[in-house]
């Protein structure tokens, strides 16, 4: 019986995956810290949930999504990967298969339209 040896990029036997959701303002600081230590990861973005330009949040709001123009600037200058998450952040578990597929495919299409390239 043949042995199967799994390897990650660069021939590494192990890998750590970092992934973050939703395109929030805190991602900009996270990118700076991670890149200082040579870390990379994936941001899972919901393109149907971008707030309007000029949005303001109440003091103390923690989950502050970035508007589209800021999101493009923040992620374009990073070495992190952008991934489709679901267009409206719907729970895919309870959706019919065709609706779940539409959530993912529409998100992917929108992210490509705004210049977020797949890597």
What is the meaning of each model-derived region?
Residues 1-18, 72:
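N-terminal pre-catalytic segment of deacetylase/amide-hydrolase enzymes
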Residues 18-24:
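Active-site-adjacent substrate/metal-binding segments within catalytic domains
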Residues 24-25, 88:
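Short, glycine/acidic-enriched loop or turn micro-motifs at the edges of active sites
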Residues 27-28, 91:
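Generic hydrophobic alpha-helical membrane-span motif
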Residues 29-33:
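A short acidic, amphipathic alpha-helical/loop segment
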Residues 37-119:
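Metal-dependent polysaccharide deacetylase catalytic core of the NodB/CE4 family, i.e.
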């Amino acid at each position: 019986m043949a042995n199967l040896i799994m390897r990650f990029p660069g021939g590494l036997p192990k890998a750590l995956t970092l992934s973050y959701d939703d395109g929030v303002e805190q991602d900009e600081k996270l990118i700076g810290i991670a890149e200082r230590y040579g870390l990379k990861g994936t941001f899972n973005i919901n393109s149907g949930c971008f707030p309007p330009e000029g949005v303001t949040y109440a003091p103390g709001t923690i989950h502050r999504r970035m508007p589209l123009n800021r999101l493009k600037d923040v992620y374009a200058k990073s070495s992190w990967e952008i991934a489709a998450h679901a267009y409206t952040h719907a729970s895919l578990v309870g959706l019919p298969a065709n609706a779940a597929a539409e959530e993912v495919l529409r998100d992917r299409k929108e992210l490509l339209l705004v210049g977020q390239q797949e890597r």
